[in-house]
Amino acid sequence: MYTYLIVDDEMIERKGIRMLLSRMNIRENILEASNGEEALEVFEKEKIDVLLTDINMPFMDGIELLSRVHEEYPGTETVIFSGYDEFSYAKKAISYGVSAY
């Protein structure tokens, strides 16, 4: 069984991603965090297989979160979902091994 972590400061966005996962018949262990700091706390307690994160969040943004996860939890599959379409974000995300943007 895989464990998924959805990270976004907007609850409606987290619910939307959860709904999309459900439509894809992914109903495994799905956890949530509202920012990067909370996400790292979840990583300390749980083995996360797939990280789905927004970029623009308070306290710790998604790019910094990706950097930390890449260093501290190698092998975690990562996916960014965001309204930002700037190449600089995608380039940074790719450097941290993001699976999809």
Residue spans for each PLM region:
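Generic anion/oxyanion-binding catalytic loop in active/binding sites
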Residues: 6, 28, 79
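Conserved Asp/Asn-Gly motif in the active-site loop of CheY-like receiver
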Residues: 33-37
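Non-catalytic signal-transmission and effector/linker regions of two-component phosphorelay proteins
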Residues: 1-3
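CheY-like receiver
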Residues: 40-101
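N-proximal short alpha-helices
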Residues: 6, 12, 16, 59, ...
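Acidic di-acidic motifs
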Residues: 8-9, 54
